[in-house]
Design a protein with these regions (language model features):
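Gram-negative bacterial Sec-dependent N-terminal signal peptides
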Residues: 2-23
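N-terminal charge/polar-biased segments
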Residues: 24-25, 270
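Solvent-exposed N-terminal domain segments of exported/luminal and surface proteins
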Residues: 28, 33-259
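Short, His- and charge-rich active-site/binding loops that engage polyanionic ligands
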Residues: 267-268, 273-281
Length: 281
């Protein structure tokens, strides 16, 4: 019986893909709802039925008043530092909330009686700068998918499809959700095993999206910016066995006519090599 489901799933996926290709762009009138009836990225502005997701109230843009942030390397301030949790889930009451907990979270309560989850109110208080709003609104009426799901066309930065109509748009939204021009972060963490052993992993990570360059006027597309939507550089800082390894990746916006470019540097051999095995996971 399980094999009989495959044609149905395949047929449904085909219909969804076809629907997405047929309705990639929206009207000027519908795009005008972005920032008014909708969040600038397309989400509903109002609260959901039970109030667990509140209304979007764009009262802040950037650093909220009264808070200090010295910049990269410093801890970001918490605008809700005085807020108290509305619920504390413990090993004693977690089964009452099982429908909202993953299997892993439930297992933690079983194994570690002192484990707790503090639940705070959801907030939607931050706004989006006007340049990004205009880019996303422009995309809504101009950007489209072609060549199945492989090619993004007439894109000018920001989220590609704020009002998606099918699966291809949702896929491209995952690739264009970050609206920064450049991004730099150092990931540093430990994986802790059940026996208490720890695995240290640290990466210095840079990413650039040339389409989000503020110097590009709204409506500047791949015809000017070029065929690559994201550039990524990473360097391994830990563990010691991989320290110094570097990776550079270029992601195209047209996967039909351009491949992902990737190179790695191995400090052991002091060689740079193409890395076709770096895939899309």
């Amino acid at each position: 019986m399980r094999y009989a489901k495959r044609p149905v799933v395949t047929a449904l996926a085909s219909v969804l893909l076809a629907a997405g290709l047929a309705h990639a762009k929206v009207s000027e009138e519908e795009a005008a709802t972005l920032g008014t009836e909708r969040h600038p990225f397309g989400a509903e502005k109002g609260a959901n039925a039970d109030g667990s997701i509140p209304e979007w109230t764009p009262k802040w843009l950037g650093l909220p008043p009264g808070l200090d942030y010295a910049g990269p390397g410093e801890t970001r301030p918490n605008p809700y530092a005085d807020e108290k949790p509305i619920l504390v889930i413990t090993a004693q009451n977690y089964k009452e909330h099982a429908e909202n907990l993953s299997e892993g979270q439930q297992a933690l309560f079983e194994r570690y009686p002192e484990y707790r989850i503090l639940v705070y109110p959801t907030r939607r208080d931050f706004d989006v700068n006007e340049r990004i709003k205009e880019r996303v609104k422009w995309n809504a009426v101009h950007t489209e998918v072609s060549n199945g799901v492989e090619t993004l066309k007439n894109y000018n930065g920001g989220m590609a499809f704020p009002i998606p109509t099918g699966v291809p748009e949702l896929m491209w939204n995952m690739r264009t959700a970050n609206c920064y021009e450049s991004y730099h972060v150092a990931y540093d963490g430990y994986g802790v095993f059940a026996n208490g052993e720890r695995a240290h992993d640290a990466v210095d990570f840079w990413q650039s999206n040339p389409f989000n360059n503020p110097a590009n006027p709204v409506g500047t597309t791949e015809a000017v910016v070029g065929d690559y939507i994201v550039w990524t550089f990473s360097e391994r800082l830990a563990p010691q066995s991989t320290k110094g390894q570097m990776t550079v990746v270029q992601d195209p916006m047209d996967f039909k006519n351009h491949k992902r470019n990737a190179w790695t540097y191995d400090p052991g051999t002091r060689r740079v090599r193409k890395a076709p095995a770096i895939g899309y996971d």
